[in-house]
């Protein structure tokens, strides 16, 4: 009887390892779609908010359009550079600005590549470079 258990154990172990490898492969292939849930807006979309704002655009080194919003207040104490989460777009995240403008801070929020009006393909390196473009904007 002990001999029969060994082949069954090997089959179960083989199936578990195979299932694990398939799961890892699927997660690797689809990780971008599982992590980032962008909302894409028309390039002619018009934002509307209660607070005054300026729409800002930058062109990255690779030609991608980077879209952002700058919410301004009179005599700001400083500026908040806000990077939103892994979903949505500026239409949704622009609402966060009022949480900071009520305390007299300017707010700049950007859309990542492939979100909202921003174009281009995301990579970790490009996301850092894009963040630097907006950082340079708020520190000038």
Residue positions per predicted region:
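Generic, low-specificity signal for short hydrophobic/alpha-helical stretches with a mild N-terminal bias
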Residues: 8, 16-17, 40, 50, ...
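N-terminal Lys/Arg-rich, disordered targeting/topogenic segments
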Residues: 1-8
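A short alpha-helix capping/helix-coil boundary motif
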Residues: 9-11, 24, 33-34, 74-77, ...
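Residue-identity detector for threonine
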Residues: 25-28, 39, 48, 101, ...
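Residues at structural and domain junctions
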Residues: 8, 12, 21, 117-120, ...
């Amino acid at each position: 009887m002990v001999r029969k258990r060994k082949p069954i154990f090997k089959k179960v172990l083989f199936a578990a390892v195979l299932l694990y490898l398939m799961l890892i492969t699927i997660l690797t292939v689809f990780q971008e779609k599982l992590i980032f849930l962008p909302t894409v807006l028309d390039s002619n979309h018009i934002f509307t908010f209660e607070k005054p704002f300026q729409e800002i655009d930058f062109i990255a080194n690779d030609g991608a359009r980077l879209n952002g919003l700058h919410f301004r207040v009179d005599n700001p104490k400083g500026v908040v550079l806000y990077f939103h989460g892994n979903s949505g777009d500026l239409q949704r995240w622009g609402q966060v600005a009022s949480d900071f403008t009520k305390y007299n801070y300017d707010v700049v929020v950007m859309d990542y590549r492939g979100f909202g009006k921003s174009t281009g393909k995301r990579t970790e390196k490009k996301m850092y470079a894009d963040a630097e473009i907006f950082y340079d904007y708020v520190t000038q």
